[in-house]
Amino acid sequence: MTKTDPAPMAPPPRGEEEEEEEEDEPVPEAPSPTQERRQKPVVHPSAPAPLPKDYAFTFFDPNDPACQEILFDPKTTIPELFAIVRQWVPQVQHKIDVIGNEILRRGCHVNDRDGLTDMTLLHYACKAGAHGVGDPAAAVRLSQQLLALGADVTLRSRWTNMNALHYAAYFDVPDLVRVLLKGARPRVVNSTCSDFNHGSALHIAASNLCLGAAKCLLEHGANPALRNRKGQVPAEVVPDPMDMSLDKAEAALVAKELRTLLEEAVPLSCTLPKVTLPNYDNVPGNLMLSALGLRLGDRVLLDGQKTGTLRFCGTTEFASGQWVGVELDEPEGKNDGSVGGVRYFICPPKQGLFASVSKVSKAVDAPPSSVTSTPRTPRMDFSRVTGKGRREHKGKKKSPSSPSLGSLQQREGAKAEVGDQVLVAGQKQGIVRFYGKTDFAPGYWYGIELDQPTGKHDGSVFGVRYFTCAPRHGVFAPASRIQRIGGSTDPPGDSVGAKKVHQVTMTQPKRTFTTVRTPKDIASENSISRLLFCCWFPWMLRAEMQS
């Protein structure tokens, strides 16, 4: 296998903010483990990560015996070990201290850089403290060892212009923040990063809702009144809950606490605008609903994607402003009507969702009033809605060439009937054979007989039969995963049962909308993309070279 030289991906030149340092000298190979550590740092050329012969995985696993032989083999070079560290997988990041120690044993200078990402071993250690992928304890052990050997906290990656403290704040690792600031110079805590609008580490923590890192930075003297290039202090870059998507109501609790923490930390001599958006806390919820033509119990559409029943409107403890609580038709929510221990309404688990008032509109396809008059959706009267389905079907027969707008919306809201041809997950075609509740999962499910044997069963799950089809032709999917692509394929005699199931469906099809980017997204897109490049590109490059 020939090694690919990613020369076109060379890091850009240093910015003005980078500390003065001696010129790095590229070296072709790492020194042997017995060689003394060099006096000057160098930039190591990029290399692919070594893997055992006939290895089943595309990433390096330090827990595997074959990989351990490579890791502890003196012939494994420093560039190859840097390539292993670049792999953003838990198996590698949890062993950052072991791999880092092997790099140092081979004579690596404590401030040597990886030629592909321009990151030092201390940068990698701070990144490895990320919760979920990394291990903060292992990252702290390696960082303490590097700092004891004289690692420079002020060095920056030329890709992201971030130093070690910026990485620790970005990945919300307060233990690393304490270690880095313990012996660092005072000006390090307020050092700025050009890719985050020349904001400090406190700005980075605030904009990414890193509450733990923000508290630690304030404890160590971070300036809460320092302004970035846009004239914003850290409290002003905290994401506003009103701009968050529908599934981030819980994150609003963190945003509120973080903004309060930063505002209270600002000296009294510094004046800050306490309100950046209109405050509707004193507006009664019923007046807000009346202005929108809504009332509790109405069928609503959230952000053009999810349908449900309006259960609450008013102020909340987790964020300022007016919020609406909706009981969704499908278990696609985040709660049961309570957030942070405060109950606002009652609904089944995973069917409650909070959203700003601006993201709610009245659903066109409203069900009978009996469905919205009680907190919990009761079982529907099939005999009555079946007749309604027949009337709609007859109306379409009278004028098939020009159906009314109402009938089209009814068909769209119904998704599909038994016997309809559908597309599952945008990939598999089949015919609807079942719709209703199941024993294997809550909510309503479609049972589809696929055209090809790419399914999971023959219409039965865990011994319960819902429909009949050939083996491996059956699959179940929620309404959000199917798309109607044709009419019914069943004989006319089966249409009555189809209408009955047709009217039970109450979900709107999901539509694709262009996400509105907030100023925070636009301001930080360069830094985020570069950071993701440093994490993922080396692994992608390795996979491409193997293929």
Swiss-Prot record:
Modified residues (Phosphoserine): S399, S401
PTMs per UniProt: Palmitoylation by ZDHHC17 regulates association with the plasma membrane.
ANK repeats: 117-158, 160-191, 197-229
Basic residues composition-biased segments: 387-399
Keywords: ANK repeat, Cell membrane, Cytoplasm, Golgi apparatus, Lipoprotein, Membrane, Palmitate, Phosphoprotein, Repeat
CC per GO annotation: early endosome membrane; Golgi stack; membrane raft; plasma membrane; recycling endosome membrane; trans-Golgi network; trans-Golgi network membrane
GO biological process: fat cell differentiation; membrane biogenesis; negative regulation of microtubule polymerization; peptidyl-L-cysteine S-palmitoylation; positive regulation of apoptotic process; positive regulation of D-glucose transmembrane transport; positive regulation of endocytosis; positive regulation of protein localization to plasma membrane
One term of GO molecular function: ganglioside binding
Xref: InterPro entries: Ankyrin_rpt, Ankyrin_rpt-contain_sf, CAP-Gly_dom_sf, CAP-Gly_domain
Subcellular location: Cell membrane; Cytoplasm; Golgi apparatus, Golgi stack
Coiled-coil spans in chain: none
Bias-annotated ranges (Low complexity): 367-377
Chain spans, region GoLD: 488-547
Modified residues (Phosphothreonine): T374
Stretch forming the signal peptide: none
Compositionally biased spans, kind Acidic residues: 16-27
Chief place where the protein resides: membrane
Membrane topology reported for the UniProt record: Lipid-anchor
Top-level taxon: Eukaryota
Record text on subunit structure and interactions: Homodimer. Interacts with AKT1 and AKT2; when AKT1 and AKT2 are phosphorylated and activated, affinity is higher for AKT2. Interacts with ZDHHC13 (via ANK repeats). Interacts with ZDHHC17 (via ANK repeats).
PANTHER family to which the protein is assigned, alphabetical: CAP-GLY DOMAIN-CONTAINING LINKER PROTEIN 3, DYNACTIN 1-RELATED MICROTUBULE-BINDING
Described purpose of this protein according to its UniProt entry: Functions as a cytoplasmic linker protein. Involved in TGN-endosome dynamics. May modulate the cellular compartmentalization of AKT kinase family and promote its cell membrane localization, thereby playing a role in glucose transport in adipocytes.
Miscellaneous field: The N-terminal half is dispensable for proper Golgi targeting, whereas the GoLD region is required.
Free-text note on domains in this protein's UniProt record: Microtubule association is inhibited by the ANK repeats and the Golgi localization region (GoLD).
Identification of the protein by name: CAP-Gly domain-containing linker protein 3
